[in-house]
Amino acid sequence: MSYAVIVTGGKQYKVAEGEFLKIEKLEIATGESVTFDRVLLVANGEEVTIGAPVVAGAKVVAEVVSQGRHDKVRIIKFRRRKHHMKRMGHRQWFTEIKITGIQA
């Protein structure tokens, strides 16, 4: 089984071909292809290539499946004994992708 570790949106993801993944929002239309050049590691069976910091010539190709928002994260700020409470919520945007190829 081959897999790779990519960097996008300030986070690292371990990806394999055919896998679906929710990442930070990308400004790319649904159905279009996206290429990730920042590949930190590529493994193909027993052969593992680790980049310093990235693997030269490696890229991961994916297709944008959908755009959406995660479930709401709710927070409450509360001050004891002061009869003060503040409720807030946030929904983060995401892009769902399908990994179509790993090239090393």
Swiss-Prot record:
> Record's superkingdom?
Bacteria
SUPFAM superfamilies given in the database record:
L21p-like
Q: Which UniProt keywords apply?
A: Ribonucleoprotein, Ribosomal protein, RNA-binding, rRNA-binding
Identify the GO cellular component terms for this protein: cytoplasm; ribonucleoprotein complex; ribosome
Which GO BP annotation is one of this protein's?
translation
GO function terms (MF aspect) = rRNA binding; structural constituent of ribosome
Question: Pfam families recorded for this chain?
Answer: Ribosomal_L21p
Q: Which InterPro entries match?
A: bL21-like (IPR028909), bL21-like_sf (IPR036164), Ribosomal_bL21 (IPR001787), Ribosomal_bL21_CS (IPR018258)
Q: Does the keyword Thylakoid apply?
A: no
- Entry's family note: Belongs to the bacterial ribosomal protein bL21 family.
Among NCBIfam families, the record links this protein to:
L21
- What is the documented function of this protein? This protein binds to 23S rRNA in the presence of protein L20.
For this protein, the record's PANTHER family field holds: 50S RIBOSOMAL PROTEIN L21 (PTHR21349), LARGE RIBOSOMAL SUBUNIT PROTEIN BL21M (PTHR21349:SF0)
Q: Subunit arrangement?
A: Part of the 50S ribosomal subunit. Contacts protein L20.
Full protein name: Large ribosomal subunit protein bL21
Organism of origin = Pseudomonas putida (strain W619)
